[in-house]
Amino acid sequence: MSSDSQRPRVVIAGAGFGGLTATKNLAKAAVDVTLIDAQNHHCFQPLLYQVATAALSPADVAWPIRAILRNQQNARVIMAQVTGVDVEARRVHTTEVDLAYDYLVLATGATHSYFGHDDWAPYAPGLKHISDATEIRRRFLMAFERAEVVEDDAERQRLLTFVIVGGGATGVEMAGAIAEVAQRTLRHDFRHIDPRRSRIILIEAGPRMLPAFPESLSDYAARSLQSMGVEVELGHVVTGCDGRGVTLKDGRRIDAATVIWAAGVVASPAANWIDAGHDRAGRIKVNPDLSVPGRPEIFAIGDTASVTYSDGRPVPGIAPAAKQMGSYAAQVIAARVEGSKPPSPFVYHHAGDLATIGRKSAVVKLGVFQLKGFLGWVFWSVVHIYFLIGIRNRFVVALNWLWSYLTFQRGARLIGVSSR
């Protein structure tokens, strides 16, 4: 980085899709950029569920942030947790150091929302970070190991029952992957249990799964999961969750050793740090240029920002939206530094939606264009490999998928020690 103290200082909090894109798009700007993240790696979240279900290893879906930005001379990386912002002094507080800024980009993302029941978190982990994925992998693989030695039939069935709460893309992909592990990968590996007798239950509070997709594709996904042995429960709300299973609003009790939460998210505390207006999910309400009202030097992007289409619908909290916001915020900052005309107000361009159901089936919607089944899965695979960071990761993931497709085996079935 330049030692010229006159260069504007840009601090970017969060190295997810939005924060990393903003950093890279400021490479040619006359600014000094500091990127802060609690992790030393950028994680490709769309494939985290494959780490959680033993198809991929953590290193296959992550890349060191410093390696990504190695050749960007105006950027440095600080590994720390942001704890607050002094908007008057223009300083960011972290667990390691305080940083002064001229421009601040808040890209701190979101975490799991248990809708007022945070006490459920220890029993129903969500999927946002590498550590979440490895913990879920440990839990669901250990369930089979424990079922192998338990004598009580009821306890064995509880161990072999897996509940996924939430019928969005993550929930659908998790349910399909766990079903494949039980039905295919593990079917010959145990002597006293038959993994194929496992129960995989997907619970969705709404009338259909994958609500972002056309109803025809949602129905196709439901039928595909059911053909894989997944029990699809639509229109059911979880009202209780503990170490023994879940309770539904209709009074039913489902005993399960493994519960996975994919039902909702809430933004980071960033709105509280800067005392900004926010929506019900904690996302900061922003101006058309993604700056914070009353604080033109502060921007919020990705899951940290509440952004809507012209008709009032919220922009989805997905990677493409975060990347577009990150690129746009960088353009605004660069224009201000150069004294040039600012870009037009931010408009999100939605390319489409994708979700995989299993090893050879997916649903895809790109405008009026729709795919499902094997062709959808091929398209889904190509898109995800293309957007992975690092040639090595793309090559390894492609080989793993080919091996899994041909053999039904998963090469990342190591059970680690719990950190929770």
Predicted regions and their residues:
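FAD-binding core/adjacent interface of flavoenzyme oxidoreductases
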Residues: 1-7, 75-163, 260
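FAD-site-proximal beta/loop scaffold in flavoenzymes
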Residues: 122-152, 244-247, 253-324, 331
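Rossmann-like dinucleotide-binding core of oxidoreductases
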Residues: 156-213, 231-233, 316-335, 340-345, ...
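A Rossmann-like FAD-binding core segment of flavoenzymes
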Residues: 73-84, 179-288, 292-294, 341
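Beta1-alpha1 glycine-rich phosphate/pyrophosphate-binding loop at the start
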Residues: 2-79, 83, 169-213, 260
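C-terminal, flexible cofactor-proximal segment of oxidoreductases
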Residues: 7, 330-420
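Short hydrophobic core segments
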Residues: 13, 99-111, 129, 238, ...
